[in-house]
Amino acid sequence: MVGTPLFSNAKKILLLGSGELGKEVIIEAQRFGVECIAVDSYENAPAMQVAHRFHVIDMKDAGALREVIEREKPDLIVPEIEAINTDTLKEMETEGYHVVPTANATKLTMDREGIRRLAFEKLGLRTAKYEFAENLEELKEAVQRIGIPCIIKPIMSSSGKGQSTIKSEGDIEKSWDYAKSAARGIGTKVIVEEFIKFDYEITLLTARTAEGTRFCEPIGHIQIDGDYHESWQPHPMCAPTKAKAQEMAKKITDELGGYGIFGVELFVLDDEVIFSEVSPRPHDTGMVTMVTQKMSEFEIHARAILGLPVNVDILFPGASHVIKSEILKWAPEYEIHEASKVKDTKIRLFGKPIAKVGRRMGVALAVSDNVTKARENAEKAAHLVNIK
């Protein structure tokens, strides 16, 4: 049951992190009459622009986070980013607050060490070989054991920040410095991963609901420097490989528990499925579902956490392509007229108050009768958007 927003019987969601994904979650939640409060470290973040109200705090600050939760007394606390004091969330959960999907799932998936140890050491899922390092000497030793080339990432970061490929011993110190510069929250620890020459990688959006676990059609994607660049749905998979992917996704999401959508990232090599990462929230590659599915990943997430039924059916093949800034500008302007002419394509601008070089400022979404054409149109439209 939901009440009426801004009245005493309102059902309230507190969104921790107010980026473009959270913005869409709030829009969907408000369609069900939910009162939405957005939180982030800077004013006028995308989700704040559609929320009933917002707070600006450092979410890694335990006292500030506790204060805003106790002030708002939300029915659901919905994390959207990694830079959150998860120990405070665990404390608040023991005091009766509901963290989506659970506080433990949020903590485990906020750092790569927690989720990798869970996946490989506890659940026995196939992963890339990995080591952890806390200083440069440990990193050099880990690289020797894993072998070159290999991937280095901070154990806590987002959108590919701090990730690099070590192609020779001369890259080690540079990669270490880059990882340290982008690390969030947990010192300078890094994960060193085996470089896998996979055939392709997918995101398998996995919805845990009161009625069971449902899987969206696989989403193919391309990352550049660890950051989402384009995605498409459906990505073709043979039935046995898809079944393996779904089995792996169910195993990890069942262990994490709770309700909501999970973005499970997987590599596929021949007919083998290799676990990469999981996010207990909508996934950036899943923005394509805004045009391909009966219900977008954001509607599915909102419905699942509210205990409502979901539909994961796909309607059309489609694709997404990021719109990135090439300039540094406060309150940028966008020329979108030409981009809007591209057939069966939609432009979604996030409304971020500052454009930075390489920052994701929007996305182009396209549908067609085949994925190839949709990808071409999404890319064309994205490149026609002029940010000034």
UniProtKB/Swiss-Prot annotation:
Mg(2+) binds at residues 265, 277. GO terms for cellular component: cytosol. It catalyses: N(1)-(5-phospho-beta-D-ribosyl)glycinamide + formate + ATP = N(2)-formyl-N(1)-(5-phospho-beta-D-ribosyl)glycinamide + ADP + phosphate + H(+). SUPFAM superfamilies: Glutathione synthetase ATP-binding domain-like (SSF56059), PreATP-grasp domain (SSF52440), Rudiment single hybrid motif (SSF51246). ATP binds at residues 112, 153, 158-163, 193-196, 201. Pfam families: ATP-grasp (PF02222), PurT_C (PF21244), RS_preATP-grasp-like (PF22660). The keyword Ligase applies. One of its GO terms (biological process) is 'de novo' IMP biosynthetic process. Pathway: Purine metabolism; IMP biosynthesis via de novo pathway; N(2)-formyl-N(1)-(5-phospho-D-ribosyl)glycinamide from N(1)-(5-phospho-D-ribosyl)glycinamide (formate route): step 1/1. N(1)-(5-phospho-beta-D-ribosyl)glycinamide binds at residues 20-21, 80, 284, 352, 359-360. Its EC number is 6.3.1.21. InterPro entries: ATP-grasp (IPR011761), ATP-grasp_carboxylate-amine (IPR003135), ATP_grasp_subdomain_1 (IPR013815), PreATP-grasp_dom_sf (IPR016185), PurT (IPR005862), PurT/PurK_preATP-grasp (IPR054350), PurT_C (IPR048740), Rudment_hybrid_motif (IPR011054). The keyword Ligase applies. Keywords: ATP-binding, Ligase, Magnesium, Metal-binding, Nucleotide-binding, Purine biosynthesis. Residues 117-306 form the ATP-grasp domain. It comes from the Archaea. GO terms for molecular function: ATP binding; magnesium ion binding; phosphoribosylglycinamide formyltransferase 2 activity; phosphoribosylglycinamide formyltransferase activity. Homodimer. Belongs to the PurK/PurT family. PANTHER family: FORMATE-DEPENDENT PHOSPHORIBOSYLGLYCINAMIDE FORMYLTRANSFERASE. Involved in the de novo purine biosynthesis. Catalyzes the transfer of formate to 5-phospho-ribosyl-glycinamide (GAR), producing 5-phospho-ribosyl-N-formylglycinamide (FGAR). Formate is provided by PurU via hydrolysis of 10-formyl-tetrahydrofolate. HAMAP family: PurT. This is Formate-dependent phosphoribosylglycinamide formyltransferase. It comes from Methanococcus maripaludis (strain C5 / ATCC BAA-1333).
